Amino acid sequence: MEETKHIKISDYNYPLPDERIAKFPLPVRDQSKLLVYQHGAVSESHFTSLPDYLEPGELMIFNNTKVIQARLHFRKETGALIEIFCLEPIQPNDYVLNFQQTHHAAWLCMVGNLKKWKEGPLHKEMTVKGKPLVLTATRGKCLGTSHWVDFTWDNPEVTFADILEVFGELPIPPYLNRETTESDKETYQTVYSKIKGSVAAPTAGLHFTERVLDALKKKGLDLEEVTLHVGAGTFRPVKSEEIEGHEMHTEYISVNKQTIEKLLAHNGETVAVGTTSVRTLESLYYIGVTTHMQPDASQEELHVKQWQPYETHPELTTVEALQSLLDYMNRHQLDTLHTSTQIIIAPGYTYKIVKKMVTNFHQPQSTLLLLVSAFVKGDWHTIYDYALAHDFRFLSYGDSSLLIP
């Protein structure tokens, strides 16, 4: 563990000119370029050819989270504009229940122009579903760099989900350096997004179209879904010299029992679409270790801590860990596992479940680049040097890669 903790983030830097960051997506999602890294060799293709590089019987896992319109703008009587960015629900802390509220919802929020919001509530008049209402935001206690914010409204026929849909703005990554456009509402969601909760898209999935999904099924792959709600922490740069000083953000995950049964039963490789699916799948192993050690743990106690994989724990096989988790779900009569993960995957980590990965090109000095480096056993430079030399587009709206170490 000590070696991993002392990794210098400066060793994971590379020059990324601004013009290589894709500010907008391509007109057709699946026309993006695909870099294929296979056992150390690099080639390039187009995303529509992805099925050609995969095998029948493989299990492909997607993150079906949906980005919410999490940015709310209020104007004070003084004229000052305050932005409230909803990060995660506090009261109720269950996403579905929070979105269903009809009078009050509390969220952990980042507040823009905080110095202009010293005290008192903010108000916004609006019409939702033809119904007039006043939304009030009241700032509570400071929680680290974020704040507790209570939202109340005076029309019980309107849910908090309705309010976000009408009043909220889709949050796009800060490095795009532009305003959100109407087209982002469609292009910054995957075609299979279902479960509301993310404040950033699982961007590896943005390339998939119905025709690519159909081609994968025709090839004989089994497609399954998990949910990880992507937090704003995904954009937080590593500011410490060594990664030991970087605190990973907690993200909420949901996995159906059927998916865990599939992971246990299938004989082919597991292909993860995106780093969020990777983090969810790899977390399942450590959740299985916890259920092995604490058979009656609550779902909250199954939370995967940042450094847990690097600490001493029973050396279960992947099958043993997944079976332990499945037994736990059967004992507790759970159809779906709801917990959270803070896992950091960096060089020194041994992958337990994921054998192939579809992912975009990530920011320099980011934890996502560490995750990729751990997967390709340090050979990330080969991939990124090729992508830079061959006009690949980078970051959220950029091109894609298939990694087969």
Where on the chain are the PLM-derived regions?
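Surface-exposed, charge/polar-rich loops and edge strands
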Residues: 1-405
